[in-house]
Amino acid sequence: GEVTSKGHGELQADIDNLKAGMAAHGATRGFMNAASPGVISLFLQNQHYATREAYLAALADAMKEEYETIVGAGLDLQLDCPDLALSRHMLFADLSDDEFVKIAAMHVEALNHALREIDPARVRVHICWGNYEGPHVCDIDMDKVFSTLMKTRARYVLFETSNPRHAHEWT
């Protein structure tokens, strides 16, 4: 069926728990993770919408409220976006790198749509190629997706590239 929010009861409980823990330890700044529209589409495949774009748009609209609720509670928002790298070899292995970059750009566009009313200074994005035990020989190179990744409406972009497969990209 259509993508809809199931409400913010569980989210509010998570926010309340985090803020209580922060207060108990004197922390004045905290962040809460949330899934990006793209990562949701990676693990929950579209079974309703006519196109991937329509599915991503529906996910972005549904997640927008969650993102705004987190930031509205005084927390920073961390979006987990392994879809911008990991999905290259998980879901889109049949595409060329250039075709995948177009998919990643579509995911960034959906994410930015959901973030359009949030100050980028309150947002960080986590991008990775997956934390599975394996050689990572099918990972897309950072230089092929970097400019697309940097278009996210986030001041902070975190790249998890500490496995040996990506060492050459930082040295």
Model segments located where?
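Domain-level signal for soluble alpha/beta catalytic cores
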Residues: 1-171
